[in-house]
Structure formats: structure tokens, C-alpha cells
Amino acid sequence: MANRSIRDGDNPELLEERRMATFDTDKMAAVIYGSEEFARRRREITDAVSKIPELADIKPYPFLTREEKVTEGTRKISILTKYLNQLIDRDNEEESLHLHREVIGYEGHPFALHDALFIPTLQSQASDEQQEKWLERARRREIIGCYAQTELGHGSNLRNLETTAVYDIASQEFVLHTPTTTALKWWPGALGKSCNYALVVAELIIKRNNYGPHFFMVQLRDEKTHIPLKGVTVGDIGPKMNFNAADNGYLGLNNLRVPRTNLLMRHCKVEADGTYVKPPHAKIGYSGMVKIRSQMAMEQGLFLAHALTIAARYSAVRRQGHLDDKQVEVKVLDYQTQQHRLFPSLARAYAFIFTGFETIHLYSQLLKDVDMGNTSGMADLHALTSGLKSVVAHETGEGIEQARMACGGHGYSMASYISVVYGIAIGGCTYEGENMVMLLQLARYLVKSVELIKAGKAKKLGPVASYLADKSDETDLTSLNGYVKMFENMARRQAWKATEKFLKLMESGESREVAWNKSAVELTRASRLHTRLFIIEAFMRRVSRIEDIPVKEVLTDLLHLHVNYELLDVATYALEFMSFTQLDYVRDQLYLYLEKIRPNAVSLVDSFQISDMQLRSVLGRRDGHVYENLFKWAKSSPLNNADVLPSVEKYLKPMMEKAKL
């Protein structure tokens, strides 16, 4: 079998690992990225980028100031725009995303939200006439846009957004206004200094009637001078935990007037006389958010893959301590504790990516259905992606932090780059909806499903919730399907338990809101179990369709590791369905599959095919030459430009001289 990462001159420690591969890493990459064609295109794009010197980092990112990071991201994006047509198919979103990650990494750039939310929202919410006016300009990058929804005082609670858009019938204009400090738009990427347009989410008000949040196309800056327009207050919100090459911003609007036709009108409309034509589905305007959430499982899986590539490779290079042979130190990756720290997260990375394929497909199908006037799948996908967004982002953060600690002291260095990946990934716990709020949105769906069953209407359940009506308590763990049944038992029991608590509180006289709040912890637990069940099923479905036998065998091992680890992780919910003997069996199976995965561990992370340019890690570099390059990296620190720092001359030397007196 072939690990395609082998090159002459590699560290012998990694060469030894790669020669143990039982599968072809290119074929595994085709499974990870959905097709042989796209896996090949990723490699071609990576190779092409490596031949353009202008796109190389001017110096390691950790040594750049914030302003230098913003400038570097902007420099690269301007150069990249020049080469786009020869590097990628501009209509291929996957190719574009890979190219930008290859060149810019995770630090951010002015077109991140432009491509991820601004353009997709125009595609899904703007009428044909509006798309003709704005969409091609956005695609050509004549204008730079952002998505301005979150406010300083309100994030996930869209019902209480303060920004208003009052319709003036006489002038046929909307008057947009942020009446308070807490109404300021806050956080949108590129809003601070880069973008000149924004899709502003504001409360639509006609004749004092509030029709809820709607999208408005708003010009913020003059297209020639880039100076903010009158009535627009805009700026950068300052440094963040990470993503500091992005100018996340604030926006205030002081009675800014825009034409009536700047309301995005694909699904709703305001006539000249103020007549409001409502959309076919109340949440159809949220399709942009649903898209982001549908992509998040895959995106977070790739963040986790990035960190694990670094940690697994370094763990195969690092030797410390002894086992049987007292003359040779052992590879850190041979310790069971290190395997237990990394391999379950590796299984999750694959599981999240495979789950992402399913949700992206479901979103694509939803768009087709909506165009045909069918919005029946909206609630199901909204609930599913809400749960996935929360569970996957949280578990990814946990896995990345474990990967960092698995690298020992060097993991704490910015040379590892893991802390950067962590800072980006855990942003997913709050952007596009705070995690607890997302779990509770899924919980509403689960409660409604249980109520349907109680009312004898189980046939109305969506396919994802149909197990809630099952009465089987099967506990056979001799097959993967048995593990699925066990998770169904746990998720069903918790969903019913949480729903019954909620209903009993209302029966006792509590208001619906208070009863919901008092049941919230149990409801979020139900949502997590439901989501983890879906992830396991998605992993199983993907593995079942693989045709290459060696690839299928190693992914089956990874799947077995995953289901055993996940079951142990939530074992308190399983105790009423399984014996302690079965629990011991699950634990033994986990340790067995840690051993089975060990020979393929490095090849499994190599299969993600993350280049050194994108990896940006001294510890995880492909050739494994860690120590000499760590020394080289340290010497490049700007503090080493002078043997004696000005601060030493100014403060320390006088202090020490004074102490001698």
C-alpha cells in the first residue's frame, strides 16, 4: 500500500510510520473530500500556489502585529484575485475555499464573509432583478460585502433586534436606524475597514406594524474614496482571541435612507403603497444561516484534522521514556494514554466530515425544494443543523485542546500553530448561534416530535426523529447496528424524560417560558444525544458505500473505535439498558481498536493532505524535521534582532547598577 507523503530526506521516524500504511492515502483523500476528482484538484491547486512566490508568507504569522496581519491578508487577497481564473473554477465553492485556506490559512481576509455569506444570501434572498444589479458585481469583487445581523446587545435572539427599517410611503424609501448603543451591529467580518456594502438585518416596520427581521442591501462607503457615507458610523471592534487578520466591525446607522428595492425580495415583497407580501415560510429568510450551519460539521472536522495532523506526526517523532527496550526511548505515540488522547478525536474528525457531506446535500436539496415552493423540509434541517453546530463545535474544541496538550511543552508554543486553530474553531461555539441556544432550538423540535407521538400522529415524524416512536430496548452490542440501537434507546429515553418534565411543569401551573427554562438542562442533554446518534449513523452510511477494500477496512476500525468511545462517554445514560459486563466489553473493545489504529495513525492524518503552507506548523511539518526547524523559528523572533533590548538599557541595567550600591 502507498502513503503518498513519502519523500527523500524525510525524518526516518515518519518514514517508518508511513511505510506501515495498509491503504493508499490518495484513495482515502478521495473519500474524505468526496471524489477522486476534487482530491486531485486540491493537490493541483496546492502545487500551483507553491509556484507563485508572491503568495508566500512574508514571515511567520505569530511574529506579525495585528495591523501587519490585516495588511498581509489584504495583500494576499489582492494578488490572489489576479490569479483566480488560472488557479480555480470560480464557480466551484470547494475549490475557492481550499485555495483561500492554502494561501491565507485561518487568520482571515476581507472576502471571507463576502464569499461565505454575502454572495450566498444574495443568491437565496434577492430577486432576479436584484441579482442582476448586485450579484455579478459581488462575484467580480467590484464591491465587498458583509452580513450584518448580530448586534452589540442581541445575538441569537433575532426577535429582539433593535435596528429598524421604517418604510416611508411618500418617498418609497426605507429609513434604517440603530436607536441605541446596544443596537449597533457588532462582529461582522470585514465590516470594520474593508467592505463597502452590507446586508443589514433590520426589523421591517410599515405603518407602525412590525413584520420582523428582513435583509436590506446597504451601501456603507463611497465606492471611489472608501469614506463612510453620511449617516454611517463604522469601525473595527479591536483584537480578538484569534482571527486577527480580519477586521470584524461595528456599524451604526443614523436614519439612513435606502430605496424600497433594497429590501431583498425573492420570497417577500413590499409594494410601493406599503402592502406587505409575506414569504411562504416564516423562517425562509434564515436560509443563509442554515447554509453556514450545514457546512459547519465538515468545517469543524477539518479544523480538528489540522490539529491532529500536527499532534500525530509530532507524537511519532518525539521519543520519551522506555517500555521494554531500556536502550531506546519510545515514541510518544506508542503510549496508550497518547493514543486514547488522539485517536478518538481522529475518529470524530472523520465522522464530522462525513456528517458534513450529508447536511450539505440536505441543504442543496432544500434550496431546490424551496424554489419549487416546497418548504416542508425547512424545520427539520434547521433543527438538525442547530444541534450539529453545537455538538460538533464543542467536541472539536475539546479535541484540538487535547491535541495541543499531547504535544507537551512545545504545543504551547505558537510554533505548533495549534493554539491558532483552537482560537478559530471555538469561535464556532458562539457565531451563527450560541451553543446552548442552538441545542434548545433542536429541543423544541424533539418536544414537538414527542407530542406528535403522544397524540397518535407518529406518521408525521420526519425520518431523523422516527426512532422516538420505537418501543424496542435492544441491547445487543455484537454489531454496529446494536450500537445504533443503544444510542436510539438513550436518545429516545432522554427526549421523553425531558419532554415529560416540561409538560408536567406546565400542568402544575408554570408558564410555558418558565417551564421551558426549568427543563432546559435536560432538554439540552436530549439534543446532544440525538445529535450524536445522527453523527454515528452518518459515519456508518459513508463507510458502507466505500468500494476500496483497504480504505474501507481501516475506516471500519475507526468507526468501531468511534462507537465504543462515544458510548463510554455517555455511559450514564446507558446504565438502564446495559449491564456492567457489557460496559466492560465496550471498554475492552475501545482499547483493542486503539491498537488496531496505531499502525495507520500517521497515514490517516496524512490523508487529509494539508500542505505545510496551510499547516503553518513547525511541529507538524511533513518531513518531520522538527527540532532543527524549531530552533530556526525561534531565532527568527524579532526580539532576537538585537542582543540588548532597549528595555534592558532603559530599565534593567539602571536597576541592577543601583542594586550594587
UniProtKB/Swiss-Prot annotation:
Motif (Microbody targeting signal): 659-661
Enzyme class: oxidoreductase
Description of what induces expression: Induced by high temperatures (25 degrees Celsius). Down-regulated in dauer conditions.
Necessary cofactors: FAD
Pathway: Lipid metabolism; peroxisomal fatty acid beta-oxidation
Keyword rRNA processing: no
Residues annotated for substrate binding in this entry: K283, I284, G285, Y286, R293, Y431, E432
Localization: Peroxisome
Binding site for ATP: H340, S390, H394, Q402, R525, A526, S527, R528, Y573
Active site per the UniProt annotation: E432 (proton acceptor)
Keywords: ATP-binding, FAD, Fatty acid metabolism, Flavoprotein, Lipid metabolism, Nucleotide-binding, Oxidoreductase, Peroxisome
GO cellular component, one term: peroxisome
Annotated control of activity: Activated by ATP. ATP binding leads to a conformational change that promotes FAD cofactor binding and enzyme activity. ATP binding likely occurs during acox-1.2 folding and/or dimer formation. The preference for processing substrates with shorter fatty acid chains is likely due to the closed conformation of the active site.
Positions that bind FAD: Y147, A148, Q149, T150, G155, S156, G189, R318, Q338, Q339, H340, R341, G409, E434
GO molecular function: acyl-CoA oxidase activity; ATP binding; FAD binding; fatty acid binding; flavin adenine dinucleotide binding
Enzyme Commission number(s): 1.3.3.-
SUPFAM superfamilies referenced in this protein's UniProt entry, alphabetically: Acyl-CoA dehydrogenase C-terminal domain-like, Acyl-CoA dehydrogenase NM domain-like
Catalytic activity: asc-omegaC5-CoA + O2 = asc-omegaDeltaC5-CoA + H2O2
GO BP terms in the entry: ascaroside biosynthetic process; fatty acid beta-oxidation using acyl-CoA oxidase
Origin superkingdom: Eukaryota
Assembly: Homodimer. Forms a heterodimer with acox-1.1.
Sequence similarity: Belongs to the acyl-CoA oxidase family.
Known function: Involved in the first step of peroxisomal beta-oxidation by catalyzing the desaturation of fatty acid-derived side chains of ascaroside pheromones, which regulates development and behavior. Specifically, shortens ascarosides with 5-carbon omega side chain (asc-omega-C5). Does not shorten indol-3-carbonyl(IC)-ascaroside with 7-carbon or 9-carbon side chains. Does not catalyze the desaturation of fatty acids or hydroxylated fatty acids.
Protein's name in the database: Acyl-coenzyme A oxidase acox-1.2
Species whose genome carries this gene: Caenorhabditis elegans
Gene encoding the protein: acox-1.2
